[in-house]
Amino acid sequence: MAKISKALRTIPIAFIKVYQWFISPLLGPRCRFYPSCSHYACEAIQKHGTIRGIGLAAVRISKCHPAHEGGYDPVPLAKQDAKPENNSESESLLNQPTETKSL
């Protein structure tokens, strides 16, 4: 199953890479976002899978027009990346009693 999932991610990324190598240089820099829409699409597919990644890329590409100001627009974190990790150091800091000073 993992091989199928990887293959499904590789195919659209290969098409995007062909665009980046052969078509984009002919058009020149046009994207109003950072990272560019094609880089965003590759990263979205890698982080979120083919279906959700293509959906995120489609939304991003639909915003890439002169009426939108553009700017920095990173790929959102995947659900597993957004969960806070169980970090014993941060837990110990949160569980320490606070000192109160009386005046």
From Swiss-Prot:
Lipid bilayer topology: Peripheral membrane protein
Coiled-coil residue spans: none
A Pfam entry, by short name: YidD
Keyword vocabulary terms for this entry: Cell inner membrane, Cell membrane, Membrane
InterPro entries: Membr_insert_effic_factor_YidD
Localization of this protein: Cell inner membrane
SMART domains, per database record: Haemolytic
Principal place of residence: membrane
Keyword Nucleotide-binding carried by entry: no
Compositionally skewed regions (Polar residues) per UniProt: 87-103
GO cellular component terms, A-Z: plasma membrane
Region feature Disordered, mapped onto this chain: 68-103
NCBIfam families cross-referenced by the UniProt entry: membrane protein insertion efficiency factor YidD
UniProt-listed HAMAP family: UPF0161_YidD
Entry's family note: Belongs to the UPF0161 family.
Entry protein name: Putative membrane protein insertion efficiency factor
